[in-house]
Amino acid sequence: MWKERAMEEMKKAGLRLTPQRLKLIEVIEKIGGRHPTLKEVYEEVVKEFPTMSFSTLYSNLLIFRGLGLLDFFTLEGETRVEVNCEPHFNVIEREEIRDFVDEELIGEIERRLGRNVKVVNVFMEDRD
């Protein structure tokens, strides 16, 4: 689903769907839901395109971001890819990051803070 949307947005923007961009789209479709680091995305792409530079990868990710297809967030000093661009929570527990959507709670946070919320990162630890 994300792949089709990405290809459609690129077409609407008049951008070429090069083999490298297609591979990047496929990688994000495959691993984007687990909020990969930029390094993890790069490592997947260079398996098929070993000559692609990190700079080229990042430039294309910025294009995708400009098209509203993804965003970035930083966690523990590493930039991660966020494919869910709707307001939500990233629930972070140990090594796992899960999306959690609660529109009512987001609305309450927005009312209390007087801000529009894009994403809230929540770090969880067990009580025991």
UniProtKB/Swiss-Prot annotation:
The keyword Endoplasmic reticulum does not apply. It holds the Pfam family FUR. One of its GO terms (biological process) is regulation of secondary metabolite biosynthetic process. SUPFAM superfamilies: Winged helix' DNA-binding domain. InterPro entries: FUR, WH-like_DNA-bd_sf, WH_DNA-bd_sf. Transmembrane segments: none annotated. GO terms for molecular function: DNA-binding transcription factor activity; transcription cis-regulatory region binding; zinc ion binding. Keywords: DNA-binding. The keyword DNA-binding applies. Belongs to the Fur family. This is Ferric uptake regulation protein homolog. It comes from Archaeoglobus fulgidus (strain ATCC 49558 / DSM 4304 / JCM 9628 / NBRC 100126 / VC-16).
